[in-house]
Every structure is written in C-alpha cells, then in structure tokens.
C-alpha cells in the first residue's frame, strides 16, 4: 500500500524539524534508526489485536504480545514515552495527510475526482474538571468529549480522520477541509455526502460561494409539503429503487428562493403526492434519481464503517490528558446570544421611551395651540355679541351679526371636539407606549440578570488532541491494513469480515512461528469448524502465492494445521 514509506518519512521529517527548532532537546525513544522505530509503532498499531486499549494496559499485560515477531513485548513506560515524543514533534496532522494520500491512491488509483462520505464520531471524555462540552448522542447528554471527522470513499474505504474540539460544527470546518484535502491528495473532490447537520443554509451558502458539490438532507423536512416548492422538471424513478420517484425543486416563495442558493430534490413513493424525503445541496450535473441513491450509500460506506472502528479499533478510547486553560467558548457564545437579546430589548425600550417623550411634547404643543385658538375665538365671540346688542339698541339690522356669532360658536364647538379627539388619541398612544416601556423595563432586568449569570470568567480545560490524533491515524491505518488483507489474501467467504470479527477469528489465532535463515514459517492451530478450516486454507494459499517477504527479506509462509496435527 505504500504506508511504510509514508510513515517513516513523515515521522523522521517531524523529528528533524523539531530538533532544528529545539536543539537542546533530546528524543531518546524516537530514534532515527528505522529498525528501532517500527517495533514501537507496531506495539501502538496492534493494540486492538492484542486486546489492550492504551499503552498503560501493557503494565499488567501477561500475553505473548508481539514476542513472536520481535522477541519481546514493550512495557508501559517505553510506549508511553515514545507516544509522548511523537506528540512533542507534532506528527499527528502531517501523518494524517500523508496516509490519506496513500489511501486515496491505493483504493481509487488514477486522478478521477473522488466522492466522499463524511460524518462526525463523537466520543465522550469522562472528567470531573470543568471542560468544553457538547452533545453526546450515544449517551443522550451534554458532556466533555472529542469530535472525530471521518472520511470514507465508495465501498466504505477509509480515507482519513481528524480530531476537533467538542464544540466544532460542520458548517465552519467542511469547506476549508475539502480545499486542504484536495491539495494533500492531489485529487479533486467531486461530491461530499453528509447527514442533516450539513443541510442548513449557512453551509449551503459556503458551498455555493466555493462552487462545490454536496448532498445532504433538509433539516425539519417533514414540516414542508409539496405546495412549498415549485418543481423543476418531471418526476423520475430513483436509481435501484423502482418504487420511488424524485424531482428537482425550488422554494415557491420568490423571496425565499432568491435568498437561498441551495437546490432541492424531493422523493416520494409511487402513487403518493407528498414528498417523504427532501434532499438539499449543490448537485452539479447529477440527475434527480441519483440523489437519493447516492445519499443512501452513507449507511454502508460511512455509518457502519465508523461502527467497525468503534468495535474493532478502540475508536472510543481517549489518548492524552494534557490540557490548556482558556475561556469557555460555549459560555462565550451563550453570553453573546444573551447580550444580543439584551441589546434588542434596550433598543426597543429606547424607542418606546423616545415615543413617550415625543407624545408628551405633542400633547403639550396641542394643549398650547388649543388654548390660544380657544382664547381667540372666545374674544371674537364676545366682541361679536356686543356688536349684536349695539345694533339692537340702535334699531339697526343685526341678522348678519347674529349669523357671525353662530358661526363663531360652531367654530368653538368644532375646536373643542377636535381637540378632545386628538387628545384622546395621543393619550391612548402615550398609554400604550408607557405600558410597553414598563413591560420592557422588566424584561430588560430579567435578560440582564440572565446574561450576568452566565459565567464567562472561569477558565475551562481544553484537552490537547495531538496524541489522540496520532492514535486515530494508527487506528485508521490498522483498519485499512485489514481491508487490504481482506481484499488481497482472504478467502472469498471472508471478504466481508469486520475488523472485530477478523481479530477474533484470525489475527488472534494461536500458532507456532519458526524463523529460518531464508524464510519465516507460521503454522496456525486448526479450526473447530470445517468451513472456517477450508476458508483459512484458501487464505493461506492466496497469501503464499503472493510471495510476501518480511522486513529483513526473508520469505513469509503461513499455513493452518490439519485437525489433530498441531
């Protein structure tokens, strides 16, 4: 597979770079001699095969271990110091990139763009200390842990894995990781398939801006009906599922459609009108019938393969407990959200208080204007009445003067009526704004108290994930080596064996190893069941036909003893 060269070059380059920048330091356990390097790496690599979870388990280990290969089994302290020195030289990320390139070229030779399946594996970290926390689905609780970003290709081939803090989100990591992965692999990524965590609008906007293709599921898909979409094209049968059909669609709301760069693919059973599944993403030139088929490959190619690592390669085990202290990012985000709510309430309260002040000014202005107009009309009305009396005393015609008096009375009544109407309207508005201001004042006090109750001062622990990344690299390496052995050497009936099952049936099989000058002979104990005995005989024959040599050049021969011979 080419992993030997990749591991050696990456480790030695990291060691040289570390010693150049730290000339006073010494790496006693991380030797430049490759022959001394591999025994320690193999002890870490084959921990699941030996039935141990972490280096400290070798402290009480009583098995044969790798004694048949190296003549000895390392104990706890040597392996722990070796792993610690690998951590010091920061080999985790470079090793992950180098091995990813090897895996991609091994399983998918050539330069064709790759379709990858991605998902998080979240493992808990049991600690009593205040640490970054997130949701752990398998435990149904919020607790400290580590997120591992797992990448698989078609047929479930492992392409790589990276550790992230527990509060990481796919929206902020995936597009950048794809670009970096293309550089390290030297291959384009044709499409990325993920679960509903990647179906939101923020990630869709990032993918649209980057011009990349991805397929996900619309979150809350069952809240949408067919009337919410406008179909683009006609329904077509789903690939490998003649009982269902799919079609492309967009939002029926023009404003929503203009703001959302995502495309949608609706799927429904034949004979039904409403969609039962809504896929979203950027589909490039794929047909609507291919989208459900491709997304369904997540289960065998990604989900089940992660479970194989959990059961067969100690994926849930934590390595390394070094930490740094810093502000709790979750609490910081909670404080920022609470501060935003406080700011919204403050703006609303300020608006209502400004409205109250403005209405009071308008009431005062209205009162002053009304008083001035009322005095003027009263004065004119008094003068006109005097004029009517004067004319009556002089025996002159007073009809026109009386009409003017009646007109002034009507104007005065209209002025009073309009003033009272306007005053009542302004008082109602003032009461509404004052009531709302009182309510908002109480809400502001509550929200301010909730914001201030969020502890942003206490520092929390964030675990250093470098050692965990190194072990993740080795876990994926072990799984890929198992896949390679399964495809290259195992009998056809054993091609579907998981790593856990193969460890129980094959890798831990007792036997006898004899070292000769020109060859190494391994004789395994016979199997109890005839079908397993025949499968192992076929496996040994295929392995021996490949003429595999040990590291020192000796020919390696494996056979299984017949029942009663061993």
Predicted feature locations:
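Short amphipathic alpha-helical "interface-anchor" segments enriched in bulky aromatics
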Residues: 58, 288-323
């Amino acid at each position: 597979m080419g992993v030997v060269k990749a591991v050696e070059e990456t480790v030695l380059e990291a060691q040289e770079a570390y010693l150049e920048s730290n000339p006073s330091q010494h790496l006693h356990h991380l030797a430049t001699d490759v022959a001394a390097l591999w025994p320690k790496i193999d002890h870490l690599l084959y921990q699941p095969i030996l039935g141990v979870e972490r280096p400290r388990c070798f402290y009480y280990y009583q098995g044969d271990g790798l004694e048949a290969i190296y003549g000895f089994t390392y104990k706890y302290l040597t392996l722990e110091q070796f792993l610690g020195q690998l951590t010091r030289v920061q080999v985790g990320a470079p090793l992950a990139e180098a091995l990813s390139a090897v895996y991609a070229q091994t399983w998918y030779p050539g330069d064709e763009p790759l379709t990858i399946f991605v998902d998080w594996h979240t493992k808990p970290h049991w600690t009593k200390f205040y640490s970054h926390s997130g949701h752990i689905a398998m435990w149904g609780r919020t607790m400290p842990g580590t997120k591992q970003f797992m990448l698989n290709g078609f047929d479930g081939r492992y392409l790589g894995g990276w550790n992230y803090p527990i509060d990481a989100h796919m929206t902020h990591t995936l597009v950048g990781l794809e670009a970096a992965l293309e550089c390290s692999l030297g291959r384009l990524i044709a499409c990325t398939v993920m679960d509903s965590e990647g179906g939101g609008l923020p990630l869709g906007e990032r993918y649209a801006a980057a011009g990349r293709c991805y397929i996900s599921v619309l979150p809350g898909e069952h809240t949408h009906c067919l009337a919410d979409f406008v179909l683009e094209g006609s329904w077509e049968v789903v690939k490998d599922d003649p009982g269902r059909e799919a079609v492309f669609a967009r939002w029926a709301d023009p404003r929503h459609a203009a703001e959302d760069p995502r495309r949608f693919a609706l799927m429904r059973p034949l004979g039904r009108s409403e969609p039962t599944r809504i896929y979203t993403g950027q589909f490039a030139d794929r047909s609507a019938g291919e989208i459900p088929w491709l997304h369904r490959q997540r289960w065998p190619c990604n989900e089940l393969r992660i479970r194989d690592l959990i059961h067969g390669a100690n994926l849930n085990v934590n390595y390394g407990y070094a930490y740094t202290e810093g502000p709790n990012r979750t609490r910081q985000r909670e404080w920022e959200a609470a501060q935003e709510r406080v700011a919204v309430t403050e703006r609303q309260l300020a608006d209502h208080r400004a409205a109250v002040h403005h209405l009071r000014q308008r009431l005062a202005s209205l009162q002053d204007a009304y008083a001035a107009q009322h005095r003027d009309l009263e004065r004119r009305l008094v003068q006109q009445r005097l004029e009517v009396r004067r004319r009556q005393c002089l025996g002159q015609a007073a009809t026109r003067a009386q009409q003017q008096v009646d007109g002034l009375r009507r104007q005065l009544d209209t002025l009073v009526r309009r003033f009272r109407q306007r005053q009542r309207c302004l008082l109602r508005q003032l009461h509404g704004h004052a009531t709302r201001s009182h309510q908002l004042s109480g809400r502001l006090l509550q929200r301010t108290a909730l914001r201030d109750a969020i502890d942003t001062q206490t520092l929390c622990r964030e675990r250093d994930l470098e050692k965990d990344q190194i072990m993740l690299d080795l876990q994926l390496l072990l799984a890929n080596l198992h896949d390679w052995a399964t495809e290259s050497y195992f009998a056809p009936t054993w091609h579907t064996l998981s790593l856990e099952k193969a460890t129980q049936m094959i890798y831990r099989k007792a036997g006898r190893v004899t070292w000769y000058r020109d060859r190494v002979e391994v004789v395994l104990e016979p199997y109890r069941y005839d079908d397993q005995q025949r499968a192992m005989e076929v496996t040994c024959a295929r392995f021996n036909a490949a003429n595999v040599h040990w590291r020192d050049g000796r020919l390696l021969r494996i056979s299984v003893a017949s029942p009663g011979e061993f």
